[in-house]
Amino acid sequence: MIKGIQITQAANDSLLNSFWLLDSDKGEARCLAAKSGFAEDQVVAVSELGQFEYRELPLDVQPSVKVEGGQHLNVNVLRRETLEDAVKHPENYPQLTIRVSGYAVRFNSLTPEQQRDVITRTFTESL
């Protein structure tokens, strides 16, 4: 469990009135603010702080989700034949809009190579 503290008495004067996060599960303390002796965000073992008294501070912790990697999905509700016909007859599809990398784009504004790439990526045999 993590709790916030302000040190009110300590043998080490540089700890006085400093603010810390104590992680009782890891036995660590993270310095939030100190006048001297400790850097902001410095992590030390609680035992390194020596004897001290403190007052507990209320914490408002917002859980954060850390996502690394992942997938991206663009949904285009079309038939393959529609896109292939739009390549051959762009004049028949002036308003055909698709999603590419999160952006809406007119299919006819893409280069022929990009159009083929969209068709290939959109219509696959399997995932």
From Swiss-Prot:
It comes from the Bacteria. PROSITE patterns: GLY_RADICAL_1, GLY_RADICAL_2. Residues 5-127 form the Glycine radical domain. GO terms for cellular component: cytosol. Keywords: Organic radical. Gene3D superfamilies: 3.20.70.20. The modification Glycine radical is found at residue 102. One of its GO terms (molecular function) is formate C-acetyltransferase activity. Acts as a radical domain for damaged PFL and possibly other radical proteins. This is Autonomous glycyl radical cofactor. It comes from Actinobacillus succinogenes (strain ATCC 55618 / DSM 22257 / CCUG 43843 / 130Z).
